[in-house]
Amino acid sequence: AMIEGSGVQGILLTGGNSLCKYGGEAKERDQVEKYLLEWSMKKDLPVLGVCRGMQLVQDFFGNELNPVDGHVGARHELSIVEGRHLSDVLTKLASVNSYHEYGTKVVSGELAACAHSLDGVAMAVEHVSRRVYGVMWHSERESPFVKEEQEVFNYIFK
């Protein structure tokens, strides 16, 4: 109710600890973010989930997450899935950082994988018909900032 009439033009679901379903302890955060995702889709507003946010998007649409090895404090090259909305902007990224303990190799239902790490973990997803996207890396943790990562945000929040 508070968000109605606020002028929000898009939602960024940020990183953080795991979802409660996967050992996290922020039940209220999980509930609020699911509400924001539903609300945004009803309003046809763009949503970007970053790391935990992408995990929430995947869980919301029924994709199961599993523990993944080699994804905390690591860098990954991306294998881009051609023909996705994000494909062109993602091809400009040489590699991305990684700080997550959970992920999935199987993206199904209303979501489609846009990019995988070379070990097969989905690193970017998009909804097949709505403006909902997710990336597993943290642009804000790059130093120096990677300008090509800004293009991902520009595409989603145009």
Regions found by a protein language model. Give the residues of each.
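A conserved active-site-flanking secondary-structure segment within enzyme catalytic domains
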Residues: E25-E38, Q58-V96
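Active-site glycine-centered loops adjacent to acidic/histidine catalytic or metal-binding residues
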Residues: C51, H100, H138
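Catalytic beta-strand/loop cores that center a nucleophilic Ser/Cys/Thr
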Residues: R84, D88-S129
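Acyltransferase
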Residues: W137-K158
